[in-house]
């Protein structure tokens, strides 16, 4: 059966995802930035209260994946912390100025990660040569690659996802970006073993008083709602995957 990884942006989201049947959690902060390294408190809370595997992302900022020396130093500190807290895996990714895998720095992080299972995240979708990158990540010992097939959505990227799945001699290819209940069968149909979803929705604030005209970020953002995992959607996706496994074919 396809493994269902759910992207979570808080401890509360992780607990919802776990209760709904997620097989694994990618733990991030800041959904509006595409996911950055979660706080120490969130990491500790997840270690204490979440029993399914949790893989925190190690990403010091939003934007591209070509990092300065100081940013890379932060990544090493954060990865060592995640390792020492006992997480079974971590999610990382670095590119150089030409859009190739930053082999030297990735090698340093892999050595630092030790026994943790390392996912190379969607920096892969920004690399210049995906098949070369797959070979390099295989040599580095990466456990899985999270990718949309270098398209805006994984469904649009199905041709490259199929090619990567057929070519991989090591890393699992995990589809992510726009993975939904309605298209799960398409990823199973090309032989993938894992999918990644946010399965999220906006939850309204409990505040009754709402100050108008002031924003803590972008003016167009709603300060009185936050993004959270939709437990019902995770349950529905998990049920669909179980049904696909039971009947032994795509639905």
Curated annotation (Swiss-Prot):
InterPro entries (UniProt xref): CutC-like, CutC-like_dom_sf
Record keywords: Cytoplasm
Localization in the cell: Cytoplasm
Coiled coil: none
Any one GO molecular function term: copper ion binding
Pfam families with a match to the protein in the record: CutC (PF03932)
One Gene Ontology cellular component: cytoplasm
Taxonomic superkingdom: Bacteria
UniProt family annotation: Belongs to the CutC family.
HAMAP family: CutC
Protein name: PF03932 family protein CutC
Gene that produces this protein: cutC
């Amino acid at each position: 059966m396809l493994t269902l990884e759910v992207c979570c942006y808080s401890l509360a989201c992780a607990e919802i995802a776990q209760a709904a049947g997620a097989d694994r959690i990618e733990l991030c902060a800041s959904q509006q930035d595409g996911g950055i390294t979660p706080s120490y408190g969130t990491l500790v809370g997840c270690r204490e209260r979440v029993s399914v595997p949790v893989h925190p992302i190690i990403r010091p900022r939003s934007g591209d994946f070509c990092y300065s020396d100081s940013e890379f130093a932060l990544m090493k500190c954060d990865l060592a912390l995640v390792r020492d807290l006992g997480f079974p895996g971590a999610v990382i990714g670095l590119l150089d100025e030409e859009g190739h895998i930053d082999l030297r720095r990735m090698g340093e992080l892999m050595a630092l990660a030790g026994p943790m299972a390392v996912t190379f995240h969607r920096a892969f979708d920004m690399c210049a040569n995906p098949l070369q990158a797959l070979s390099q990540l295989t040599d580095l010992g990466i456990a899985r690659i999270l990718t949309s097939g270098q398209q805006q959505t994984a469904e649009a990227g199905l041709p490259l996802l199929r090619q990567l799945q057929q070519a991989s001699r090591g890393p699992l290819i995990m589809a992510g970006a726009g993975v939904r209940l309605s298209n799960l069968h398409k990823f199973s149909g090309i032989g993938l073993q894992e999918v990644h979803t946010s399965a999220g929705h906006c939850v309204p604030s409990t505040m009754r008083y709402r100050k108008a005209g002031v924003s803590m970020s972008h003016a167009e953002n709603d300060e009185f709602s936050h993004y959270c995992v939709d437990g019902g959607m995770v349950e529905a996706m998990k049920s669909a995957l179980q049904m696909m496994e039971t009947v032994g074919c795509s639905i």
